[in-house]
Amino acid sequence: MEKKCTLYFLVLLPFFMILVTAELEESPEDSIQLGVTRNKIMTAQYECYQKIMQDPIQQAEGVYCNRTWDGWLCWNDVAAGTESMQLCPDYFQDFDPSEKVTKICDQDGNWFRHPASNRTWTNYTQCNVNTHEKVKTALNLFYLTIIGHGLSIASLLISLGIFFYFKSLSCQRITLHKNLFFSFVCNSVVTIIHLTAVANNQALVATNPVSCKVSQFIHLYLMGCNYFWMLCEGIYLHTLIVVAVFAEKQHLMWYYFLGWGFPLIPACIHAIARSLYYNDNCWISSDTHLLYIIHGPICAALLVNLFFLLNIVRVLITKLKVTHQAESNLYMKAVRATLILVPLLGIEFVLIPWRPEGKIAEEVYDYIMHILMHFQGLLVSTIFCFFNGEVQAILRRNWNQYKIQFGNSFSNSEALRSASYTVSTISDGPGYSHDCPSEHLNGKSIHDIENVLLKPENLYN
C-alpha cells in the first residue's frame, strides 16, 4: 500500500512542480526566493521518493527505523537506538548549511515523536541557533570589504595622480606601477559592484541572468591581473639587475601582454569549465575545485616572483660586498618594497586551506583574511608610492616651493600696498608728477623684486 501511494505521488509530482514553476514566473520579484525554496524542497522530495523506491530493502537483522521523508530531508534506514545526522538544508536564508540536523530512532524501531504534538520529529533547532550572530559577523565583513576597497580606490587614484602629474617621476618602472595600480582600481570597482549588485541581491541570483556571470568573469580576470602585474614588477627588476646588468631600457610590450593578456586564459578556461561542470547561479559558489583554474596560475606567479626577488637580493648583496656601489644600494631599496609586498599579497592563498575550527577562531580567521584580501590596493599604493623616497622628495620640494611662493606673494602684496600709500602721500604735495607711481621701489621695480625672489636658486636658501 505504501509503495502504491509513493508511486502515485511520483506520477503526480511533476505536475505539482510545473504549477510551482508557473506560479514562480507569475510572482512579483519579492516572492522569487519563496518560489526557489519551494522548488528546492519539491525537487528534494521527488529525489527522496525515487531513492526510497530504488534502494534495496534492508536485509540486516534486528530492529530498525524505515527510510522516510520528513518534509525537508530524506533519511535512510537506521538501526534502533541510534541517532542519524546530516547537514542542514539551504532552503532558507536563516539556515546555516554547516550546522547539523539530527533524527532519533528509538529502541522499538520507531522514529522519535515529539511529546507536545505526538508526531515524528526531526531536530532542526541547530540550523538557525547562531544565525543572528553569523548574520552580524557577515554584515561586519561586508562593510569591512567595502571600506577596504573604498580606501584602496582613493589611495590608488591619489598615487596615479602623483605619477601622472610629476613628469620627473616618469620612467619604465613607474609605468609598471601605473598599470599595477590601475588593475587594482579596476578590481576594487568591479568587486564593489559585484558584492552590492550581485552577491547581496538574492532575487538577482535566483533569476540567474547572464550579466551576473559576466560580472564574476570580469572580477576573476582582474584579480589575476593584479598578481600578474606584480610578477611584471619582479621580472622587470630581475632583468634590470641580474640579466641586463643595470640596463636602462626594456621593451614593455611583453609586460603588457603578461599583465593584461595572460590572465584572460585562465579566466576563459574557468568560464567554460564552470558552464559545463558546475553551472550554479551567477557562479557565486566557492565550493568547487574549478576555482583552482584561477588560483593555480596566481600561486605560480607568486612563487616565480618570490624566486626572482630572492635571486635579486643575492646578486645585490654580492655586488655590495665586492664594490660597495651606491647604485646597488638604490636598487636594493627598490627591491625591498616588492619583496615585502609579494608575501603579503600571497599569504591569503597559504591560509585558505588552514581554516581553524571553533567559533572564535573562525571569526578571527575571517577578519584576518578579509583584511589581507580587500585592503591590498591600499597596501600597494602605500608601499610603492607614499613610502617611495623619490615621491616623498618631490612632494616635499613642491610643498616648500609652494610655501615660499605663497609667502612671497603675501610679502609682495604688502609691498604693493605700502608703495601705493607712499606714492599717494607724495602725490598730495605740489609740483610732483606720478605718471608711473609704482615703477620704482628702492631703485627696483616690483617685477624685478618678484624675479629675484622667485629665482629657483633662492627657493631653498
UniProtKB/Swiss-Prot annotation:
- Provide the positions where the record notes the PTM Phosphoserine: S420, S445
The GO biological-process annotations, alphabetized, read as: adenylate cyclase-activating G protein-coupled receptor signaling pathway; adrenomedullin receptor signaling pathway; angiogenesis; calcitonin gene-related peptide receptor signaling pathway; calcium ion transport; cell surface receptor signaling pathway; cellular response to sucrose stimulus; G protein-coupled receptor signaling pathway, coupled to cyclic nucleotide second messenger
Q: Where is this site: Required for RAMP3 interaction?
A: Q250
Q: Where can this protein be found? A: Cell membrane
- Outcome of swapping W72A: Strongly reduced affinity for adrenomedullin
Q: Which InterPro entries match?
A: GPCR_2 (IPR050332), GPCR_2-like_7TM (IPR017981), GPCR_2_calcitonin_rcpt_fam (IPR003287), GPCR_2_CGRP1_rcpt (IPR003289), GPCR_2_extracell_dom_sf (IPR036445), GPCR_2_extracellular_dom (IPR001879), GPCR_2_secretin-like (IPR000832), GPCR_2_secretin-like_CS (IPR017983)
Q: Where is this region: Required for RAMP3 interaction?
A: 288-289
Query: Where does it mainly reside?
Result: membrane
Give the sugar-modified residues. N66, N118, N123
Tell me the outcome of changing W121A. Answer: Strongly reduced affinity for adrenomedullin
Report the SS bond pairs. C48-C74, C65-C105, C88-C127
Which ranges make up the Cytoplasmic topological domains here?
165-175, 239-252, 315-329
The entry describes its oligomerization and partners as: Heterodimer of CALCRL and RAMP1; the receptor complex functions as CGRP receptor. Heterodimer of CALCRL and RAMP2 or CALCRL and RAMP3; the complexes function as adrenomedullin receptor.
Disease implication from the record: Lymphatic malformation 8: A form of primary lymphedema, a disease characterized by swelling of body parts due to developmental anomalies and functional defects of the lymphatic system. Adult patients with lymphedema may suffer from recurrent local infections. Impaired lymphatic drainage in the fetus can develop into hydrops fetalis, a severe condition characterized by excessive fluid accumulation in more than two fetal extra-vascular compartments and body cavities, placental enlargement and edema, pericardial or pleural effusion, or ascites.
Task: Name the protein family.
Answer: Belongs to the G-protein coupled receptor 2 family.
What's its job? Answer: G protein-coupled receptor which specificity is determined by its interaction with receptor-activity-modifying proteins (RAMPs). Together with RAMP1, form the receptor complex for calcitonin-gene-related peptides CALCA/CGRP1 and CALCB/CGRP2. Together with RAMP2 or RAMP3, function as receptor complexes for adrenomedullin (ADM and ADM2). Ligand binding causes a conformation change that triggers signaling via guanine nucleotide-binding proteins (G proteins) and modulates the activity of downstream effectors. Activates cAMP-dependent pathway.
PANTHER family on file = CALCITONIN GENE-RELATED PEPTIDE TYPE 1 RECEPTOR, PDF RECEPTOR-LIKE PROTEIN-RELATED
What is the name of this protein? Answer: Calcitonin gene-related peptide type 1 receptor
